[in-house]
Amino acid sequence: MATYVIGDLQGCLTPLVQLLEQINYQPQLDKLWFAGDLINRGEESLETLRFIKSLGSNATIVLGNHDLHLLAVSHGYGKLKRGDTLAEILTASDRDDLMNWLRQQPLFHYDEQLNTVMTHAGIPPCWDLAKTQSLAKEVEKKLKSDSVDDFFATMYGNTPDTWSDELTGLDRLRAITNYLTRMRFCDENSKLDLKSKEGINTAEKGFAPWFNYPSKVPEDCHIVFGHWAALEGKTQLERIHALDTGCVWGGSLTALRLEDKQRFSTPCTLNRKNS
């Protein structure tokens, strides 16, 4: 039995099928983790969502910012952006079933036996493992509730950009969501810079990648995340694993086998909507 963590798919089903063949995926034995951003920008978003849903209990998913964007648009909030490839999902006959399934998915996953935690963007320096799990559950509870519309109506935005335990209501939920699904750079106080999106050397003065600061997560716990294609899968830290290797941009799709930390990848052709 093996557990594989797979980076951002963004609607690229063909490379996923190729990668599963490469690792000789055995459904009766192996488990798959997906680090979020299952859909959007790639041309196979609907097929990708259906495929991952069909994996059932074999697949463990955390939501990414593109997945939340799809949910917000499906609820009538937010607008389709240039380059989005969500229209086919939004007009699909099984749209409601897919959306109901998607909003049941978590933002945080921790496996005690493998001593590995997964979120889409990472874990800020100011949170320990228990706090991250607890805060993620606040958003997950809202996503599953009948009052989710007010969350989607106020989900977009870059503030509050600094965590405080005193935050309440929708501001609190937006901050949690931004840390778990949009974070790249922060300062020593975990203040977010959500405008810089490129490589490590592009940080604004006083900011650095979140994983460059001392972490409150135990040193023997591994952190796996996606979201940041410009890292090209590299953090220079043995226990922190970046898995977005730019599949939709013509890079590669990467899987990390958790039992021995071996990486597998398959090259991708540019699979992005030309707009």
State what each model feature region is.
Residues 27-30, 56-58, 118, 220:
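A general structural motif
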Residues 8, 37, 64-65, 102, ...:
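Divalent metal-coordination and catalytic microenvironments
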Residues 12-13, 40-42, 66-72, 126, ...:
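Active-site environment of divalent metal-dependent phosphoester hydrolases
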Residues 5, 34, 61-62, 117, ...:
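Residue-level marker for buried hydrophobic side chains located in beta-strands
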Residues 133-275:
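Acidic, His/Gly-rich catalytic cores of divalent-metal-dependent hydrolytic chemistry
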Residues 1-51, 55, 68:
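N-terminal active-site segment of His-dependent metallophosphoesterases
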Residues 46-48, 54-169:
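Active-site neighborhood of divalent metal-dependent phosphoester bond hydrolases
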Residues 2-10, 116-122, 242-243:
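Active-site-proximal beta-strand elements of phosphoester/diester hydrolases
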